[in-house]
């Protein structure tokens, strides 16, 4: 478990707002007690708290790769089960790796596939990438929403974080509970309706969605849907198929 947070504004410089990310990141120390890191750009500031599991020295974040003169920077929380498959495909495309971490695999996957990178990832994840070439922030959440990620768009700012309390440390994010939030607390609490962040200024990126924020537009898109199909097999066929699926899926995890 790691923690990610950050904010951006493509219409003005935010370099003098670094203290905000420090306060936001400090709220996530329980998610990543091993180390912390920051990335600062004229329009983008990222923070990361790390729990080191794979490649403790090579997987430090935020991680930046420079391709064709443009920087791509990621903060990532998760685990990719098919890392070796995605990595091999990228190696075949001519990419090189300098670490053993899945963070680098996710970042290069985005650089090659762009938004479609999520269709190649099998795992649990929430990550944000600053794409300097396209001048955008790309945030994605895993298919079933195991890893949390919240965001707010206000006054030309994008603000995001693994937890609500880190976002509340940003001066633009209000702690006022929304009408929908009150309804959720009274009817569903401690659960929430899909996409609701309880607070007025905060939303949740739903499972199997990505958010792409440009200077003049915002795109929230669903990239995967679980399809319900009529079950027509008998008992023995069902047992064989279930056994097969377990045998191929468990080693990946």
PLM regions and their residue ranges:
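Cysteine-centered catalytic environments shared across enzyme families
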Residues: 1-253
